Amino acid sequence: MSFMDQIPGGGNYPKLPVECLPNFPIQPSLTFRGRNDSHKLKNFISEIMLNMSMISWPNDASRIVYCRRHLLNPAAQWANDFVQEQGILEITFDTFIQGLYQHFYKPPDINKIFNAITQLSEAKLGIERLNQRFRKIWDRMPPDFMTEKAAIMTYTRLLTKETYNIVRMHKPETLKDAMEEAYQTTALTERFFPGFELDADGDTIIGATTHLQEEYDSDYDSEDNLTQNRYVHTVRTRRSYNKPMSNHRNRRNNNASREECIKNRLCFYCKKEGHRLNECRARKASSNRS
């Protein structure tokens, strides 16, 4: 008897989730890997539970299989081992979720998060890379840990004096507004990036940027240790997935960087010629929809 034949519903069980999904109104937008994404686990579980509440499931086994479809290694390998250890006929969905949470969740280390933030600056990174890094680190902050005003102050301290003054002049009410204002300000004036010079028409062009590109290529760390140290038994498996570094490089190859946009006189938003960011129709249409 195969492993799947032991599931209530017999050998036809693996087809069950596929038959249910066409009537499923929402699909989880998240996946959980179990490596350096502990801060995403609560949202992942909440979204899984929300989607499951919209249709009826015949048994706990079907709910477990649905959740496992959104796990990547090493979390996927852990789920396979956990189900076999507990027994497919005895394990409940609540037990599975509780085991997933206890095994992979690590409380964020606030001191490490703030130390990582203080290492950032617009002068060193430029506004685009500053925002990218800041978002990545800030996402690990516990929800409602500080007020919106305190969050804005934390971010604006990383800006150059010129950008800081312009952002504060517009009095942003949310962190998102402050980051957007800093981005728009730099994109419109094009005067806060080192290595730029003006051509005969007064437009900004790029000077030698080889060293900047080399620094950008080494911009991504393989480990983001911003959680409290805690012993976790991890099952060692062969990697059957793409390395994170490859994903970042592919993304840079597919999307024009900020420097390339300036060099080729492209819009920062739609990457097309003939207009600037504040004139982009696609960007305005997207803002109206949201």
From Swiss-Prot:
One of its GO terms (cellular component) is retrotransposon nucleocapsid. Keywords: Acetylation, Cytoplasm, Metal-binding, Transposable element, Zinc, Zinc-finger. A zinc finger (CCHC-type) spans 265-282. The record marks G207, A208, H233, T234 as: Cleavage. The keyword Manganese does not apply. Its main location: cytoplasm. SMART domains: ZnF_C2HC. The modification N-acetylserine is found at S2. GO terms for biological process: retrotransposition; viral translational frameshifting. Disulfide bonds: none annotated. InterPro entries: Ty3_capsid (IPR045358), Znf_CCHC (IPR001878), Znf_CCHC_sf (IPR036875). It is found in: Cytoplasm. One of its GO terms (molecular function) is zinc ion binding. It comes from the Eukaryota. Retrotransposons are mobile genetic entities that are able to replicate via an RNA intermediate and a reverse transcription step. In contrast to retroviruses, retrotransposons are non-infectious, lack an envelope and remain intracellular. Ty3 retrotransposons belong to the gypsy-like elements (metaviridae). The N-terminal domain of NC, but not its zinc finger, is required for nucleoprotein complex formation and its chaperone activities. Capsid protein (CA) is the structural component of the virus-like particle (VLP), forming the shell that encapsulates the retrotransposons dimeric RNA genome. This is Transposon Ty3-I Gag polyprotein. It comes from Saccharomyces cerevisiae (strain ATCC 204508 / S288c) (Baker's yeast).
